Regions:
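Short acidic capping loops at alpha-helix termini that bridge into adjacent secondary structure
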Residues: 46-50, 74-76, 124-125
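Active-site phosphate-binding strand-loop segment of PLP-dependent enzymes
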Residues: 103, 107-165
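Conserved PLP-anchoring active-site segment centered on the Schiff-base-forming lysine
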Residues: 67-89, 101, 106
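Conserved active-site segment immediately N-terminal to the catalytic lysine
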Residues: 160, 164-166, 172-189, 195
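N-terminal "arm"/small-domain region of PLP-dependent enzymes with the aminotransferase-like
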Residues: 1-20
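Conserved small/polar residues in nucleotide/adenosyl-binding loops
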Residues: 199-206
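Conserved N-terminal alpha-helix of the aminotransferase class I/II PLP-enzyme fold
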Residues: 18-58, 62
Length: 207
């Protein structure tokens, strides 16, 4: 109810396009930037590091394909796990059709990805590691910090699908060695059709 009350004015009288310059648009833009600042604050990120999407699937899709495209000069190898969300797995399969190589890591009986397995899977041409923060089926919290440290040591970008974990466990992109993080509003009582990607230390295309 609280979320609905906050949204109602922008679905009724304050319905301006946030990308335009007229009055209603400016009001909407201010609301959008306030939301961006709020999301950034929960992650200890900068507002400029928050990119809004239409949901968790688009966030995952954008993160994986964007990194693959922007860093293909470095290599075309991606590391992920076999239990990722379909948004990740389907993006990886799409990239395989374009000539990328993807290593799909196994997990243990608890659904845990081994940081050691990640380490040994890294190659000279590895550009991205993408491992979920929390599993949507069994609830396993993955060793994101350890995997992120390995990624940093090996100079490989690290994305985590945190759709299931954001707003449930404390996450700071300033303390976690994570380059990109996906989230979705409907998992924390927000509206459906809204997601975000936080990206730190990176300059990426957002159109």
């Amino acid at each position: 109810e609280e979320v609905k009350e906050a949204m109602d004015p922008y679905l009724e009288e304050k319905f301006g396009n946030a990308s335009t310059m007229y009055g209603y648009g400016e009001t909407s833009r201010q609301a959008l930037e306030k939301a961006r600042k709020t999301i950034a604050g929960t992650l200890e990120a900068k507002p400029s590091e928050i990119f809004f999407t239409s949901g968790g699937s688009e966030s995952d899709n954008w993160a994986v394909k964007c990194i693959a495209g922007e860093y293909k000069h470095k290599g075309k190898h991606i590391i992920t796990s076999k239990i990722e969300h379909h948004a990740i797995l389907n993006s990886c399969k799409y990239l395989e059709e374009l000539g990328y190589e993807v290593t799909y890591l196994d997990v243990d009986e608890y659904g845990m990805v081994s940081p050691e397995a990640v380490y040994h899977a890294i190659r000279e041409d590895t550009t991205l590691i993408t491992i979920m923060f929390g599993n949507n089926e069994v609830g396993t919290i993955e060793p994101v910090f350890s995997i992120g440290k390995i990624a940093r040591e090996k100079d490989v970008l690290f994305h985590t699908d945190a759709v299931q974990a954001y707003a449930q466990v404390p996450i700071s992109v300033r303390h976690y060695p994570v380059d990109l993080l996906s989230a979705s509003a409907h998992k924390f009582h927000g509206p459906k059709g809204v997601g975000s990607v936080s990206y730190t230390h990176l300059t990426l295309p957002t159109t």
